[in-house]
Amino acid sequence: MGTLTPSACTPALSRAGVVDHGKISIGDLSYDAYLPEATLALSVNCEAATLMAVKATDNRSGSAWFGSDTDAVFGLGFYGGTWRLGGYRLMVKNVQADGAVAPVIESVDGQTWFPISQDQTWQPLWMRSVGAPGEVDAMPVPVQNLAMDVMVQTRVRKPRGAITEEIPLDGSATLDIVYL
C-alpha cells in the first residue's frame, strides 16, 4: 500500500564547517587572546515545511576555557594532557526562515523554549529554532528553508612553560538536525 515518511532536511555549512586561524606565534599571545571572529553560513533545506531545530554538541567536551564563561563555550582541546587551550563561542545572526527574518528561540530539552537575541551565546547541547514573528509564546514553527550566519569567537589561553612543538587548536562541534 505504501509508506508514510517524514520530510527530510539537509544541512550545509560554508567552508565545509572549518574555521582555520592559521599559525599563531606563542610570542604574540598575552595570557589569553581573542582571535579574529569567523563566520560560517548555515543553511537547512527541507523537502517540505518541517518542525525542526539545530542542536550543537561539543566534541571536545571538558576542554573548554573561556574565563568565567567556560560552561557556555566549546573546547579547543588540551596541551600536555591537562592544560585547557581555550574555547570558542557560537552565536547566530541574520536568521531567516523561508526568506523572512525570524525570531530565534532555544531549548535544552525540545519542550520548553525561550526567546533569545541573535547574538546570545549558543551553549553546547542546546537547540536553536525559529518562532513565529510577533508571537508571545516561544514555540518552534515549521520551516522549509532556514538560513543563518554562525559567528565563531575564539579565545586562546597561552600555555605555561617552554613550548617546543606546535600545538593544534583542536576544537570540534557537531550541528545536528533534531526533528520535533
Describe every region a protein language model picked out.
Residues M1-L180:
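Mature extracellular/passenger domains of Gram-negative fimbrial/pilin and adhesin proteins
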